[in-house]
Amino acid sequence: MKQITGINHVGLRVRSLETARAFYEQLGFELIIGPIGPEPVAVMLHPSGVNINFILNTTSDASASNVLMDLPEKHTGFTHIALEIDDLEAVQQQLAAREIPITETVELPDGAILIFIRDPDGNVIELHKPA
């Protein structure tokens, strides 16, 4: 799809938001949002434009493999990739034409639209249309 213009952010489930913040600050990231929300999320931004969303993990089994956002039990690890798009309607039409189901659509308070799909292995992909 030529409407994808780049990676918007990466989601990472962590055991401690404070520990993650301290580590990623050493790499040049700066906290820009949070922690906020019922399942606390903190957002850090690198001067290069790389954006990481850290989501607090509340499950103690570190060896488990479920990191998907829409399942009730969570574990550490990457949760999804977010691809930035520039034409929401064209993307929705292309997904429908390819019989790729949209699992969730979210409109953020700033007007951005998020469409969630899964790859054949069940990995979550967010298609992010900025406001």
Predicted segments, located by residue:
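Vicinal oxygen chelate
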Residues: 1-7, 30-82, 92-118, 130-131
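Polyanion-binding surface elements
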Residues: 10
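Conserved beta-strand-loop-alpha-helix junction that forms the acyl-donor binding cleft
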Residues: 14-17
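Short, conserved charged micro-motifs
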Residues: 19, 88-92
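Conserved active-site tyrosine of GNAT-family acetyltransferases
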Residues: 20-25, 95, 122
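Short glycine-/small-residue motifs
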Residues: 124-127
